[in-house]
Amino acid sequence: MSCVDQIVKTFADLTEGDREAAMRAFSMMMRTEPVRQTPAAKKKVNGFMSFRSYYSPLFSQLPQKERSPFMTILWQHDPFHNEWNFMCSVYSSIRTYLEQEKVTLQLWIHYRVRHLGVIIRDNYMASFGWNLVQLPNGTHDLERTALPLVQHNLQPMNGLCLFTKCLESGLPLANPHPVIAKLSDPSYDMIWFNKRPHRQQGHAGQTYNSELGVSALFPCNHAVAAAVDGITDLPLSHWLQQGDFGTEAGFSPQFETLLDSILENGNASINDPYNMALGMGVPMMG
């Protein structure tokens, strides 16, 4: 007798009540947990996406087919790519927490623009010499009448510092503690010092020549963080990136010496920060 036949015979010999109880027992044994679907990871926001979101209203009177090429042109000649990428790297890492409290990308940009030296929307066209002109056929074009010098006064800043400044400016976040914990994680907090030219290149394009690219991981309460926070203004050639949107090749003995000195004195008080400008052989600027 096959196993199936044996099971059928066994059930046939049971009373109706026992048969129902056995069926319930079998049903419980065969029940499986529902498959939990993990939400798909959202695509990281890049610099151009946020740039377009912020400045697109400059051309709100134009149809989309005209507006999009103009945004591409402005982005190609914008000197603040690294600031936009830095902001987006921070946003992408804390996006889940921000969206839980209805903080949109547009709202995040609104509160962070003032802290990164980026030109505000209303002043953008005039600041970079752009004019929107109407052609005889009724279409529009961008005309550039000036190529200004661009100075980057970005103070050394990490993701936690940027987020804190946004909170101080009024970013509406009822529970900032999970974000602070995320940005305080030393495995996330990466500081890159780089050097790039101060002048925006010609209409044909622009090139950033990084002379120094060294990354280092530090907890936010490390002496490095204290030193960075204590500098009021490094020379304009120094700026900071954070995140995983790119890497730079290069080596600087001066910067390596600086890091070694700080690491050797890792227990230094935050009230006695290491003089980074002195370590790098550059003057402090008050």
Curated annotation (Swiss-Prot):
DNA-binding segment(s): 40-95
A single GO molecular function term of this UniProt record: DNA binding, bending
GO cellular component, one term: nucleus
Entry's transmembrane regions: none
Localization annotation: Nucleus
Signal peptide (from-to): none
Record's keyword annotation contains Isomerase: no
Alphabetized UniProt keyword annotations: DNA-binding, Nucleus, Transcription, Transcription regulation
Annotated GO biological process: positive regulation of mating-type specific transcription, DNA-templated
Primary location recorded for the protein, binned into one broad class: nucleus
KW Nuclease (keyword) present: no
Pfam families, sorted: MATalpha_HMGbox
Family of the protein in this entry: Belongs to the MATALPHA1 family.
Function: Required for expression of the heterokaryon incompatibility and sexual functions.
Name of the protein this chain belongs to: Mating type protein A-1
Biological source species: Neurospora africana
The encoding gene: MTA-1
